[in-house]
Swiss-Prot record:
Activity control: Inhibited by zinc.
Residue pairs linked by disulfide bridges in the UniProt entry: none
Listed EC numbers: 5.1.3.37
PbH1 repeats: 133-155, 157-179, 180-202, 204-226, 257-279, 280-302, 320-359, 977-999, 1001-1023, 1024-1046, 1048-1070, 1101-1123, 1124-1146, 1163-1185, 1190-1212
Cofactor(s) this protein cannot do without: Ca(2+)
Gene from which this protein is expressed: algE1
UniProt catalytic activity: [(1->4)-beta-D-mannuronosyl](n) = [alginate](n)
Pfam families, per database record: Beta_helix, HemolysinCabind, Pect-lyase_RHGA_epim
GO biological process, one term: alginic acid biosynthetic process
Secreted among keywords: yes
Name of the protein this chain belongs to: Mannuronan C5-epimerase AlgE1
Region (Disordered): 372-395, 408-428
Stretches forming Hemolysin-type calcium-binding repeats: 388-403, 406-422, 424-440, 557-573, 574-591, 697-712, 716-732, 734-750, 1227-1243, 1244-1261, 1263-1279
InterPro entries, per database record: Beta_helix, Carb-bd_sugar_hydrolysis-dom, Hemolysin-typ_Ca-bd_CS, Hemolysn_Ca-bd, PbH1, Pectin_lyas_fold, Pectin_lyase_fold/virulence, RHGA/B-epi-like_pectate_lyase
Length: 1403
């Protein structure tokens, strides 16, 4: 029941104190057994009670407070309040409150107008007492301007949820979780709070934080910690997703906590560490993006350290142990010291696997723990591996989860605490698991055995049947039994103190498997602790990497985008939810799907969660879809799966076209071409339960097959068979031989696969007999036999004939094969006038447009006649409409969306060739036409197309925008056109687009076609999926040659050519609306030349590859990347562009989309490799990356030359150049980032504040004027200063250069041009060597000023006071001045800085 507070006297006028009225409504709801207290929009002022714990409003069991929305309904503290308030809204102190909460409103603490500590929300039971608040829900709540905490669920609460809520501008933490059990924070935002964004403290456990965001807070973004009292630490905490950025301290701090997982989050821009693990145990940090932290000083991106609480409340020293870091991408800021740093304070047992680390200043990883490890490979699931030798070893574990491998010898293994795996290997081993759930693994029968005369069995000393397990899955035993036939006998000794698992089957050496366990385990073994089959390798709800072994096993990925590899053995792979990558490996593997959502796709939203099988072997492997209800292969409808080969021919998709309520349908991809190789043998389909179909198969003999009430497929094969489908909608295929076919009840299909399945000769009959054909629901499928329809039995037709008695109907061909066999089937009964294309399926026919009245004389309007032929083909179930050579004039039919000619399912237009068959718009047409030839608006059309003809828009003699070809389903609706093929078609003289497949089309192919002299683009691909443009030409179109836009993905362009177009040759772009970007595009081969703008323009798109193309002679840039991500430009020839102005050959820049999305799209992660790039005389650069946020560009092994300003300019802090050749450019005066290669490079920064990085090789770095950062990289590098004003300071400011990695043993600083004579006191032409007070930076300083007050100074990172000498600093009088002008011929690469002025002249 709802209780409106205004009915209780609340005013919500922002002035009156409404506390009493709202509380009265709460009390009334509680008295009635519960209800909703509703606060309409308004500002409700409230005041506190006598004690802080009285709060303002006390909520009670079964009561929920609901407003009209955040910012609409506001509960605000009265002005001038002076007493602390522990929760403006709170549960009652000392009472257990349950099933209560708050939603859709704002709490405002009004902290600027009061003088007390006020918290927003508070609930929880008395600390240390037996009791708890339960089932608390807060949704869509904003808490702001508190002088205390925002959300403060405090002490002993079970099952609290806070979601979709916001805390900001509060004096302490935004969100607190204090002693919360089984709760969740989901999709919340915490910003601009004076302390932490989220603070998880004091015994909180079994708690989940999912997709929360914290930024701009005065403390950390997220803290999980014990707190200031000696209480149990937080544990079993999962932090999944979300972002923690721009906070003053850490992004995430885990302090005195254990068993915490942080995964799938982005953590960046924080003042100190990105992640700090501080006296915590068993922390997992998985698959996060951690970057650009350490904004307020020099810190590691991830720090692992112990916490000294010996002088604190516990008196303990908390060592950080068992930290697991895997799959993280870590990139440092300019201040970041290490990617991952372990302090030398006892921190140990850190395990680092497959992390990507770059951009840090000191080193990627620094580990001090004796047992800490780092690997580039993925982890195995255990936190460490202890391995013995071939001798007698004693291995002892720790509190971590470890794998102990004894190898050969009589070993003693002790796992200690943790969930350990113990594998003694060969020899007689003594195995002690210790505390935790341990697994005793046996990898070979000879690891533990006895003979008739001696025992060599292993002894397990402390097996716990409740939590330990014995893994025998590699040994081939089937279970417990009598010790024979692959079983094991369980036997105890006479005293009952020892248990044996024994096999009595000996090998050739008389060895029979046996293990011993201390204790009596009779009746205690079960499937959970005695594993005969391999235990499943299980993932998590995150993105996991599971790798099998040589044994047969089951891999369960669960949620996330998992990678499963079965290895050898006959494995079962179950990816679970998410987009998974599945590799069976060697053996006969089964890929199993347990839910439709395990592998699904939504063509409306573009969400692709389809799994990929990478190594399917149709001779061994199988795909199990039995749990999904699929009954067989088919057309993708009604419980079948369609087999669809993609346009490139390198991927086979299994697709259902039946969507769920959210628009998702099942889809699965197999790498490779499996057309013709897939049948029911490769699948496990649904059983016959619940109306689903199964297969009943005969032999080569005379079979009787009987169906059931289910939908079944009966295959008679050879022989004289009798098939009866029974009930259900069945498919009956008798195969060869004279068969009798009875469908039974239901809508049955009688399928004939070859003409010899049912035939007669001149002397005998071998025809099949259908005994119970029902023309109203049954069908005869002859689609594969080549018959076009009913007729006289000749010319590919069948004669319908009834016997004289009227008791039998025949379908007969009189055309015999070489053996005199002519097709014939018989039906019991007289079906005269009852058989047609609705119940007999023929092969699509050819419909000549001239038979319908078309003239093709270039004058008559042939539209009605051609449309009649199309309609006839459609009515016949599909066919080809043939237009002989001629010019067919057509007119519009009505609305723009009606076009001229409307194609339908299964219908293809075909002519006699380009220029021979011409469909041309009539003179004088003044109507807009969205497709002269098109599919129907609002209908899903499939299996249609056009070939061997020309469409002519006649634009000189018409008005109105006219497009050539158009197809596609309604944008944003659930549906799509499918399987569209256009071949050898010319489209010309349109006032609009040429080819315009527009919105939601799956599997379209346009090949060997031409578009020219059209008013807009030649070819458009708008929301195309799994489609291809191949061997097409677009020229002289007024806009772009090819335009790929709006959500198009999984798209291939092969060997297309675009020239002479008024825009770009090829554009791939999002378009003008805020829609999904095109993605997963491959452009392979072809040429793009002599276009007015770019040769190729990529704009607001991602995951595009451009390779093996030639791009030249275009008006602006050859290739322009404009707000893109993850683009590859590989092995192209790009030359002689920039014909209409001054542009780079290849330009990378950000796109300002403030007018549509409000976003700035930076160009990121571009790879340019193996290209020949030769700038024209007009080009200012061969390759230029704008200084606009574009970054992470990688140039590898290119041949680059030319450029008026420079050959290469890279402005991104993480961009790099290596390999190949780059012509020597001219220097300029901007703020540059110059990166050398592995060769011996010369880097000249010019003026500006530059960043120079020599990379590998013996490099020369000259920053020039400006305050420069100089990194030599590996090799013997020389830092050259050509003028005293290149690096200096004044009394007012510092403009010195900084050398970041000076190595006194091989690098040199060349000051020979400056006139200094050596080291000294900084006067009389000497330089003083001075160390900073922190001991972290060394300066070379002169105290002698020039006329402008500038005195030379250079800074070096680190303490070099003891290693600078004449051997590594070159002064004017030491005879080594020649170093500054080393022979350029010996230098393989020179990179010169660039101007900050944009000279590209691009719109």
């Amino acid at each position: 029941m709802d209780y409106n507070v205004k009915d209780f006297g609340a005013l919500g006028d922002g002035v009156s104190d409404d506390t009493a009225a709202i509380q009265a409504a709460i009390d009334a709801a509680h008295a009635a057994g519960g209800g909703t207290v509703y606060l309409p929009a308004g500002e409700y002022r409230v005041s506190g009670g006598e004690e802080p714990s009285d709060g303002c409003l006390t909520i009670k069991s079964n009561v929920h407070i609901v407003g009209a929305g955040m910012g609409e309904t506001v509960i605000k503290m009265v002005d001038g309040w002076t007493q602390n308030v522990t929760g403006m809204v709170r549960s009652a102190y000392g009472e257990e409150t349950s099933n209560f909460g708050m939603s859709d409103l704002t709490l405002d603490g009004n902290r600027d107008n009061l003088s007390a500590k006020v918290d927003g929300w508070f609930n929880g039971y008395i600390p240390g007492q037996d009791g708890a608040d339960r089932d608390v829900t807060l949704e869509r709540v904003e808490i702001r301007e508190m002088s205390g905490y925002g959300f403060d669920p405090h002490e002993q609460t079970i099952n609290l949820t806070i979601r979709d809520s916001v805390a900001h501008d509060n004096s302490l933490d935004g969100f607190v979780a204090d002693y919360q059990v089984g709760g969740v924070f989901e999709n919340n935002v915490s910003y601009n709070n004076d302390r932490h964004g989220f603070n998880i403290v004091t015994s909180t456990n079994d708690f989940v934080l999912s997709n929360n965001v914290a930024y701009g807070n005065g403390g950390a973004g997220l803290v999980v910690q014990r707190g200031s009292y000696d209480l149990p630490h937080p544990y079993d905490i999962l932090i999944d997703g979300g972002a923690y950025y721009d906070n003053a301290l850490e992004g995430v701090q885990l302090k005195m906590a254990h068993d915490v997982t942080l995964q799938n989050a982005e953590i960046y821009g924080n003042g100190l560490y990105g992640v700090r693990v501080y006296g915590a145990q068993d922390v997992q940090i998985l698959d996060n993006q951690i970057h650009d932290n350490s904004q307020n000083g020099a810190y590691a991106e991830v720090l692992l350290q112990s916490y000294d609480d010996t002088a604190g409340v516990s008196g303990n020293f908390y060592v950080t142990t068992g930290t697991w870091l895997e799959g993280n991408v870590i990139s440092g800021s300019a201040n970041s010291t290490y990617g991952i740093q372990e302090r030398a304070d006892g921190t140990d047992y850190s395990s680092l696997y497959a992390n990507s680390i770059d951009g840090v200043q000191t080193g990627a990883v620094r580990l001090y723990g004796a047992n800490s490890t780092v690997s580039s490979q993925s982890g195995s699931g255990q936190q460490a591996t202890l391995e013995g030798s071939a001798g007698n070893d004693a291995l002892s574990g720790t509190e971590a989860h470890e794998t102990l491998l004894g190898q050969a010898g009589d070993d003693r293994l002790n796992g200690d605490a943790g969930n350990d795996i113990l594998d003694g290997g060969a020899g007689r081993d003594n195995l002690t698991g210790g505390a935790g759930a341990d697994t005793f693994r046996f990898s070979a029968r000879t690891d533990s055995y006895r003979t008739d005369s001696a025992s060599f069995n292993d002894l397990i000393t402390d097996f716990d049947a409740d939590e330990d397990s014995i893994d025998l899955s590699a040994l081939g035993f089937t279970g417990l039994g009598d010790g024979y036939n692959g079983t094991l006998l369980l036997k105890t000794n006479a005293e009952g103190t020892r248990t044996y698992l024994k096999s009595y089957e000996a090998d050739a050496q008389g060895r029979r498997f046996e293990i011993a366990l201390d204790g009596n385990f009779t009746g205690l073994f079960n499937d959970n602790n005695l594993l005969f089959d391999a235990a499943p390798a299980t993932g998590t709800e995150g993105s996991d990497n599971l790798l099998g072994t040589d044994a047969g096993e089951t891999l369960l990925g669960y949620g996330g985008n998992d990678t499963l590899n079965g290895g050898a053995g006959d494995d079962i792979l179950v990816g679970g939810a998410g987009r998974d990558s599945l590799t069976g490996g060697a053996g006969a593997d089964v890929f199993r799907f347990d839910a439709l959502s395990d592998s699904q796709r939504n063509y409306t939203t573009g969400d692709n969660q389809a799994d990929r099988i990478l190594d399917f072997d149709p001779t061994l492997d199988r795909i199990d879809v039995s749990a999904l209800g699929f009954t067989g292969l088919g057309n993708g409808r009604n419980g079948t799966l369609a087999v669809v080969l993609n346009s490139a021919g390198d991927r086979t998709d299994l697709k259902s076209y039946d969507t769920d309520a959210n628009g998702y349908s099942f889809e699965l991809s197999l790498a490779g071409n499996y057309q013709g190789q897939l049948s029911a043998e490769q699948f496990v389909f649904a059983t016959s339960q619940g109306g689903q179909m199964t297969i009943i198969e005969g032999t080569d003999g005379n079979d009787t097959l009987q169906g059931t009430e289910a939908n079944e497929r009966l295959l008679g094969l050879d022989g004289r068979d009798n098939l009866n489908g029974g009930a259900g909608d069945d498919i009956l295929d008798g195969g060869a031989g004279r068969d009798t076919l009875t469908g039974g009840t239901g809508a049955d299909t009688f399928l004939f696969s070859t003409r010899t399945d049912s035939y007669r000769t001149d002397s005998a009959s071998f025809n099949d007999l259908i005994t119970d054909f029902d023309p109203t629901q049954d069908r005869i499928d002859l689609s594969g036999l080549g018959f076009s329809g009913f007729g006289n039995g000749y010319d590919g037709t069948l004669l319908l004939q009834v016997n004289a008695a009227g008791t039998r109907t025949y379908l007969k061909s009189f055309e015999a094969d070489a053996n005199g066999q002519r097709f014939e089937i018989a039906l019991d009964g007289d079906f005269s006038g009852q058989l047609d294309s609705g119940n007999v399926i023929f092969e699509p026919a050819v419909f000549n447009a001239k038979d319908f009245g078309a003239l093709g004389d270039g004058a008559s309007d042939d539209r009605p006649a051609i449309q009649a032929a199309i309609d006839a083909a459609y009515a016949a179930g599909g066919g080809t409409v043939y237009l002989p050579a001629g010019e067919y004039r057509v007119s519009p039919t009505g609305e723009p969306g009606d076009g001229c000619l409307m194609l339908k399912d299964g219908v293809y237009l075909a002519g006699d060739g380009i220029g021979e068959t011409v469909i041309k718009l009539i003179d004088g047409s003044d109507q807009k036409i969205t497709g002269m030839v098109r599919s129907a608006y609002g209908e899903e059309t499939s299996n249609f197309g056009m070939s061997d003809l020309t469409l002519d828009g006649n634009r000189d003699n018409t008005s109105g925008k006219v497009d050539g070809w158009f197809n596609g389903y309604i944008p944003g609706q659930d549906g799509a056109d499918r399987n569209v093929t256009i071949e050898r078609v010319e489209i010309r003289e349109m006032s609009g687009y040429g080819f315009d497949p527009h919105e939601q089309t799956i599997n379209l192919t346009i090949r060997d076609s031409v578009a020219h002299d059209n008013g807009l683009d030649g070819f458009v691909a708008d929301y195309l999926v799994d489609s291809v443009f191949e061997n097409n030409v677009a020229y002289n179109n007024d806009r772009h040659g090819f335009n790929i836009v709006t959500s198009t993905y999984d798209f291939v362009m092969t060997n297309n050519v675009a020239y002479g177009n008024g825009g770009a040759g090829l554009t791939i772009q999002r378009g003008s609306e805020d829609l999904a970007q095109p993605t997963d595009i491959l452009i392979d081969g072809g040429a793009y030349y002599d276009n007015a703008l770019e040769g190729v323009l990529f704009k607001m798109t991602n995951n595009v590859t451009l390779q093996n193309a030639e791009i030249y002679g275009n008006g602006s840039s050859g290739v322009r990347l404009y707000g893109t991500e993850d683009v590859q430009i590989l092995d192209n020839q790009i030359h002689d562009n920039s014909q209409n102005g001054t542009y780079p050959e290849v330009l990378l820049q950000a796109f300002d989309d403030s007018q549509v999305t409000g976003e700035l799209y930076e160009t990121l992660n571009t790879r340019i490799e193996g290209n020949l790039i030769d700038a024209s005389d007009n080009a200012n650069y061969a390759v230029r990356e704008r200084d606009d946020g574009s970054d992470y560009t990688t140039l590898v092994d290119n041949d680059i030359s030319g450029g008026q300003v420079a050959s290469v300019q890279l402005s991104g802090a993480h961009s790099s150049l290596s390999g190949g050749t780059v012509e020597v450019p001219q220097g300029t005066d901007g703020n540059d980032v110059l990166v050398g290669s592995d060769a011996n490079d010369q880097l000249y920064g010019g003026a500006g504040d530059d960043r120079l990085d020599g990379g590998a090789g013996d490099d020369l770095l000259d920053g020039g004027a400006g305050r420069d950062d100089l990194t030599g990289g590996t090799g013997a590098d020389t830092f050259v200063f050509a003028a005293r004003t290149d690096s200096y300071r004044t009394d007012a400011g510092v403009f010195n250069d900084l050398i970041l990695d000076f190595d006194a043993s091989e690098d040199r600083i060349d000051l020979s041009a400056l006139g200094f004579s050596g080291f000294g006191d900084g006067y009389n032409g000497t330089l003083l060597v001075q160390l900073s007070s922190a001991g972290t930076r060394t300066y070379l300083k002169s105290y002698e000023e020039d006329l402008e007050g500038r005195r030379f100074e250079v800074a070096l990172d680190g303490d070099h006071t003891g290693d600078l000498s004449a051997a590594n600093v070159v002064f004017a009088d030491d005879g080594s001045a020649a170093v500054a002008s080393s022979d350029p011929a010996a230098t393989q690469l020179e990179v010169v800085g660039s101007s900050g002025t944009q000279t590209d002249q691009l719109a």
